[in-house]
Amino acid sequence: MFKLRIYKLSGADKGNLDHEEFFSEREEMETRYNELFVYENYSLNPTAWENVDGEWKRLEGF
C-alpha cells in the first residue's frame, strides 16, 4: 500500500496537509505524483509513503 500526502498551496493554511491519496501499486502512485509535481513548488510538492509492516515510511526521491 502506498500513499501521497498532498499539501495546501495557498491561503492561511499554506503548507498544511490538504488530503491523502492511497494506491495499491507503486506505479499508480508514481503516475499521480508526476501529475501533481511542480518544480517551483519545492517543499509543497506531495510526499510519497509506503506501508511497511503496519507503519508508514516516507519514500526517498519524492
List the predicted regions and their residue ranges:
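A short beta-strand micro-motif
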Residues: 2-11
